[in-house]
Amino acid sequence: MIRGELFELECLEYLQNKYRYENVHFHHNGGMDSTMSDISVIKNGKVAFFIEVKDNTAQSGQFVVHPDADSHSFGFSSKNHSIQNPMTYAIIDYMNNDFYRFYNAGTAGAAIDIDSSVFAGWIIGHYQQRNVRYIISHDYNYVILPIRKFAEYFSITASCRIKGSGSSKPAEKDYNFITQAIKQVYKNAIFFQNNKKLYASISAVSYTHL
């Protein structure tokens, strides 16, 4: 479990304590899978919509493009989990107008310097397609905002970069922070290390919603 997921659990606990209704429940979908929305809002036993958890520096979405050196252009990958919206075309058109800068962006990345309203439009469309209605974040206090007001609360930037796949292991220097943060939510958690990995064992009580 890494820091981003711990933040999701803290937000889940806040929602569960703040909004106590008999017919409404919150479910953490778990993991750091960016294709899965963070928290499901379940009303009368059915998923009504989703809430996305974002800290101050979180990524809000991504899509993959493939370069074509012959035509000097980028194309939207068919393997994307997201669906194209009008802002997708605007972003790709901008990249095509400066093809070689983005083609050679490398892992460091190259900034996409267009009006942030384009990025906000893409993010809002991206989340609406996934039935995400609200964002929850935290600075000094928890803030819950409608997805349509995303740009009023966040400064948005974007870049193009070559991205490696796979998850990284937590650094040993962060183990104490990780274990203490988990214990704030799960008092009975037990930890052990094996092959430079940190594992957590958590006991939970099962229950049924009617």
Residue ranges and their predicted role:
Residues 49-144, 148-151, 175-192, 199-200, ...:
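Catalytic cores of nucleic-acid endonucleases
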Residues 154-155, 161-167, 171, 176:
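Conserved beta-strand/short-helix segments
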Residues 35, 171, 191-192:
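Intrinsic disorder/low-complexity signature
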